[in-house]
Swiss-Prot record:
Belongs to the PduM family. One of its GO terms (biological process) is propanediol catabolic process. It comes from Citrobacter freundii. One of its GO terms (molecular function) is structural molecule activity. It is found in: Bacterial microcompartment. Keywords: Bacterial microcompartment. Interacts with shell protein PduK. This is Bacterial microcompartment assembly protein PduM. The keyword 4Fe-4S does not apply.
């Protein structure tokens, strides 16, 4: 292989990697079922799943291998694809916080506000101090310290406890 050919190959690889780094795929749940996981991993650096429903979130948390959408999401995460899931605000009290918080997923509501899942039993000031707005979803029996409660008010963070 001569130097010119090698240089062209390197430039093509770099070009494709740059293109992938800047590309995001936005899909509905129905469209996600139809996409090939390999295509997603090779061509996109991030996936935005629009309006996920509660059964899908529960299956993602459980790692259900029967649902192709769940398999695609887990394969994308394994390949290093950033996965952002938007969901309706009304679903927040019912989502499986502990299990979803273990996965490297990003969440937002229908208005684009960031949703942070807090799986611990105690919410302290340190947990709230890093937030600037958005929604913080807590477990059912999470204790909120007084300092954290004050910080929630000053940082424009909305607290939601699970049902």
């Amino acid at each position: 292989m001569n130097n010119e050919l090698l240089q062209r190959i390197i430039e093509e690889v770099v070009s494709r990697l740059k293109k992938r780094a800047e590309s995001t795929l936005s899909l509905s749940v129905a469209q996600l079922r139809e996409i090939e996981p390999r295509t997603l991993c090779c061509q996109y650096s991030s996936l935005h799943l629009l309006q996920a429903d509660l059964p899908l979130l529960e299956q993602i948390a459980e790692g259900c291998a029967d649902n192709m959408s769940v398999v695609t999401i887990h394969e994308a995460l394994a390949c290093g694809v950033r996965v952002k899931i938007s969901l309706q605000h009304r679903l927040l009290p019912a989502i499986p916080v502990r299990k979803l918080a273990r996965l490297p997923l990003e969440f937002s509501d229908e208005l684009g506000r960031i949703i942070v899942l807090h799986p611990d039993k105690l919410l302290s000031y340190a947990d709230v101090a890093q937030l600037k707005g958005g929604v913080l979803v807590l477990r059912r029996r999470c204790v909120v310290t007084a300092l954290a409660q004050d910080a929630v008010g000053t940082r424009n963070v909305q607290l939601i406890k699970q049902e």
